């Protein structure tokens, strides 16, 4: 992988991590088109995800800081309750990561990966369409039950091609939660799992294996900058209820991808 390829992939990751169009699916398609070696996948993916975590913290810093301050209060408060809901939502993806991480990574190397990605993009399109046309009641706050269900949706999105943000946001909306609250919760709930994965890879000594540090840094920077822009954009899109356009895009991308595989 050269520096230009790293920058292009960083841009793809930064944009698609927050848009409900599957960052893993688009990243896999981009790698296939750019001819990036598959053995570089895990190392580079971890770096790009770490960049988007940082962009999330930057964009939502006021909320992150409010939660951190409230977390250390002696009295149980709304901030501590919110953090507990975030922790609850992270349990399913933690279990999936612990039990099936190797199988999921092996799936990325499979010759039929584009078929899987295509199918998951079509599923993402379906979920977003359901969320757009459903008219549930608007709950003031996300409940513990809803937090866990949204967490289950995030665990399902471990499948390549199934959009994490699309799945969690659609699930939250179908459960009757307010758009702005769901968007914020969706972006905050992924921070700890991705940070945890990044730290585990760093501890194993594999974080820079197989790819030059400068190339890795270029991809990280590109992903961070575009991630900041995409995060702000997506929050506004969810507030305005414009998810149907992403449903149409995912359907088109899934169909084109699967046709390109068989034709």
Residue map of PLM features:
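Multi-pass membrane proteins that catalyze or facilitate reactions on polyprenyl-/lipid-phosphate substrates
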Residues: 1-263
